[in-house]
């Protein structure tokens, strides 16, 4: 259903991380100028999360990356490299610390879930590793701040770069972070209720473009 609807919106799809991704809507050059001058909204549900919980979660997450995470606070994001035993880079996710022993790795294209589960098996650490039902959107561009304020109110302006907070949109639980793939102002919106995710996508695709020419 979701792919068909995006096809009707002139979407070009591709495969990424074992999933279909709506890669492009219309003219690529116009999409670029929308990003630079206004804002672009991207369905990046292909960026899956690896959830790590348990009494030893913080210790285990530090095992995955050479970056020192000792100063990573609850509510903070970190850009990290996941490396193998030889120091080769397996992935470069955004790490979100949701609680003292509750982490997400927001991934690019690789099977880090399987890598982390394999590493945990003989680690001797008490951790649980799974893929939560979480699908992100990215809103990027210089007008993304005013768009987010119009939807979520002034609280969104309190978000610092590489920090996140919990929000709701029509009863749909979200985590919103001040992060993103572009060099412009931007946000990532993590939908935490897969059964209602299409409602939120419909809202942002149909309402925000009318107001802001997204």
Show the residue positions of the predicted features.
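Single conserved hydrophobic/aromatic residue that forms the stacking wall/gate
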Residues: 1-8, 12, 205-214
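Acidic, proline/glycine-enriched N-terminal capping motif
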Residues: 5-9, 13-83, 88
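Short, acidic/polar N-cap/turn motifs at the starts of alpha helices
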Residues: 47-49, 79, 92, 134, ...
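Short secondary-structure junction motifs
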Residues: 77, 90, 124-126
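Acidic, low-complexity central loop/insert segments
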Residues: 94-206
């Amino acid at each position: 259903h979701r792919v068909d609807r995006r096809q009707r919106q002139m979407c070009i799809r591709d495969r990424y991380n074992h999933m279909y991704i709506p890669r492009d809507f219309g003219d690529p050059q116009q999409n670029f100028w929308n990003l630079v001058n206004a804002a672009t909204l991207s369905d990046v549900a292909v960026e899956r999360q690896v959830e790590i919980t348990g009494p030893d979660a913080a210790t285990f997450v530090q095992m995955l990356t050479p970056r020192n995470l000792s100063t990573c606070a609850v509510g903070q994001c970190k850009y990290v490299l996941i490396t193998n035993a030889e120091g080769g880079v397996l992935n470069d996710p955004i790490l979100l610390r949701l609680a003292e022993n509750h982490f997400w790795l927001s991934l690019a294209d690789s099977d880090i879930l399987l890598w982390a589960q394999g590493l945990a098996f003989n680690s001797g650490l008490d951790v649980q590793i799974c893929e939560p039902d979480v699908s992100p959107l990215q809103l990027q561009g210089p007008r993304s701040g005013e768009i987010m304020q119009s939807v979520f109110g002034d609280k969104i302006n309190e978000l610092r770069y590489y920090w996140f907070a919990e929000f709701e949109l029509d009863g749909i639980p979200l985590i919103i972070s001040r992060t993103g793939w572009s060099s412009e102002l931007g946000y990532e919106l993590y939908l935490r209720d897969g059964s209602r995710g299409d409602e939120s996508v419909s809202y942002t695709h149909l309402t925000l473009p009318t107001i802001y020419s997204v």
